[in-house]
Amino acid sequence: MLVLFVATWSDLGLCKKRPKPGGWNTGGSRYPGQGSPGGNRYPPQGGGWGQPHGGGWGQPHGGGWGQPHGGGWGQGGGTHNQWNKPSKPKTNMKHMAGAAAAGAVVGGLGGYMLGSAMSRPLIHFGNDYEDRYYRENMYRYPNQVYYRPVDQYNNQNNFVHDCVNITIKQHTVTTTTKGENFTETDVKMMERVVEQMCITQYERESQAYYQRGSSMVLFSSPPVILLISFLI
């Protein structure tokens, strides 16, 4: 009985000293995937998280962030041509066409300016036929006049006479070029209409001219000059 007890005790001691298979960092399941090729590893082939063949995060074949096949940010082929687009050419101001502005000097007319558009005046010609003819054809007559600065004339009559002649001439030439002709009645009515418009233009220009002159006299007076010098 004593011999049997000693043999059983020895077997139990040997069992406690034997290593258990499949522990941490042994031939069993391991993490991370290093060591025995037969182990159950995750990831399976030594790459980073989500990398079948190695590379950065989310990169099937290597490259920068979010790049399936390499290259810079947001570029499939690695060339930086997304940020170097040529700027659009600026519009050439010489190619912008426009009508002559009111008050601007008209080229080719020797310093004449084009006045602002006016409403054609209501004129009575003394008989029903001409009155009716004017009402029906007034849209064919000018609503702007050509003129020179008032300081180039001695009086209103000279200004108006020159204004009427150049305006009717220019309007007739322009309209005839378009294939429309004027009768004697048209010319008579245009003279009356344009004359009234030239008188209105003279009054506007004279008022503006004298206002500019008054301002110059005011600012050139000695008290005002002294006051401005003191303020400066």
From Swiss-Prot:
Family matches, as InterPro entries: Prion, Prion/Doppel_b-ribbon_dom_sf, Prion/Doppel_prot_b-ribbon_dom, Prion_copper_b_octapeptide, Prion_N
Region spans: 4 X 8 AA tandem repeats of P-H-G-G-G-W-G-Q: 44-84
Superkingdom: Eukaryota
Disease annotated for this entry: PrP is found in high quantity in the brain of humans and animals infected with the degenerative neurological diseases kuru, Creutzfeldt-Jakob disease (CJD), Gerstmann-Straussler syndrome (GSS), scrapie, bovine spongiform encephalopathy (BSE), transmissible mink encephalopathy (TME), etc.
Residues noted as binding Cu(2+) 3 in the record, renumbered to the chain: 61-63
Gene this chain is encoded by: PRNP
Lipidation (GPI-anchor amidated serine): 214
UniProt-recorded Gene Ontology molecular function terms: copper ion binding
Region annotated Interaction with ADGRG6, chain positions: 16-31
Protein name as catalogued: Major prion protein
Signal peptide (from-to): 1-15
Name of one Pfam family that matches: Prion_bPrPp
Biased composition (Gly residues): 45-79
Compartments it resides in: Cell membrane; Golgi apparatus
Taxonomic source organism: Ateles geoffroyi
UniProt membrane topology term: Lipid-anchor; GPI-anchor
PANTHER family from the UniProt entry: DOPPEL PRION (PTHR15506), MAJOR PRION PROTEIN (PTHR15506:SF2)
Entry remark concerning the domains of this protein: The normal, monomeric form has a mainly alpha-helical structure. The disease-associated, protease-resistant form forms amyloid fibrils containing a cross-beta spine, formed by a steric zipper of superposed beta-strands. Disease mutations may favor intermolecular contacts via short beta strands, and may thereby trigger oligomerization.
Function as written in the Swiss-Prot or TrEMBL entry: Its primary physiological function is unclear. May play a role in neuronal development and synaptic plasticity. May be required for neuronal myelin sheath maintenance. May promote myelin homeostasis through acting as an agonist for ADGRG6 receptor. May play a role in iron uptake and iron homeostasis. Soluble oligomers are toxic to cultured neuroblastoma cells and induce apoptosis (in vitro). Association with GPC1 (via its heparan sulfate chains) targets PRNP to lipid rafts. Also provides Cu(2+) or Zn(2+) for the ascorbate-mediated GPC1 deaminase degradation of its heparan sulfate side chains.
Residues that hold Cu(2+) 2 according to the record: 53-55
Assembly and binders: Monomer and homodimer. Has a tendency to aggregate into amyloid fibrils containing a cross-beta spine, formed by a steric zipper of superposed beta-strands. Soluble oligomers may represent an intermediate stage on the path to fibril formation. Copper binding may promote oligomerization. Interacts with GRB2, APP, ERI3/PRNPIP and SYN1. Mislocalized cytosolically exposed PrP interacts with MGRN1; this interaction alters MGRN1 subcellular location and causes lysosomal enlargement. Interacts with APP. Interacts with KIAA1191. Interacts with ADGRG6.
SUPFAM superfamilies: Prion-like (SSF54098)
Residues annotated as binding Cu(2+) 1: 46-47
UniProt-listed Gene3D superfamilies: Prion/Doppel protein, beta-ribbon domain
Region (Disordered): 17-90
Family membership: Belongs to the prion family.
Keywords: Amyloid, Cell membrane, Copper, Disulfide bond, Glycoprotein, Golgi apparatus, GPI-anchor, Lipoprotein, Membrane, Metal-binding, Prion, Repeat, Signal, Zinc
Disulfide topology: 163-198
